[in-house]
Amino acid sequence: MVFVDRLLATLVHLRHGVTHDVLACWFGVDRSTVTRAIGEVRPLLAERGCTISPDVRLRTLAEVVDHLGATGKLGIIDGTEIRVRRPAAGRKDRDKFISGKNKQNAVKAMVFTDGDGRLLFCSPTRPGTCADITHARELGLVKLLADGPPVEILADAGYQGLGAQTGGRVVTPPHRKFKKNAPDWYEEMHERQRKAHSSRRIRVEHGIAHLKNWRALTRHLGRREHMDDTVQAIAGLLSQQQTADLILARQT
């Protein structure tokens, strides 16, 4: 297969979840040829990073924090789960992929968008048992925010505690001080603050929804070892589409 055909096969596989067998029939080649082609192109797409302008791409979390600090934009983070096949029977780590949230075999990725919902970064995946806040710490987000430029990052209650570790740069929903028998004035204030935070943070949910429109992330039926490249390749392609749409909108 020439490079254009290999690229096209990879894009169709990622966008529509078409199996290697079907792609082999379409291109008139052996299934192993398609598998090898996708295995070669997918890492190349993943290495491109997320496009924020025609000449600027963000490839690491440090670059994202620097970009937000330089532009003064708001950042939003959230974790998302992607269903995967259950590990084979007898494996000692078989249960670590079971999500405590959905009770399904899954891996987690941390998604980073700006205040407008534009995709800036999608992290490598972790097993479904890994908590969102643990994943953020493992990625070095706490140190990057504590030592980096002053930025504001919105997050949900799963990241409660990062605010104190980053000097207040991670903003989570207001903590409820009354467990029960709260005064009416407090209930109204807490609900108002919670809704205000949620209405700002919803943009990252939209970004995740756009990611999940790619069938390869609806449920991953391939090898889990390829998940990191798959997630980051799709994030890069989606961010490039968002940037192109934004440029076109400005020209019209």
List the model feature ranges, each with a label.
Residues 2-16:
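Short, amphipathic alpha-helical "recognition" segments used to contact nucleic acids or chromatin
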Residues 22-46, 54-252:
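Short, well-ordered secondary-structure "scaffold" segments embedded in the functional core
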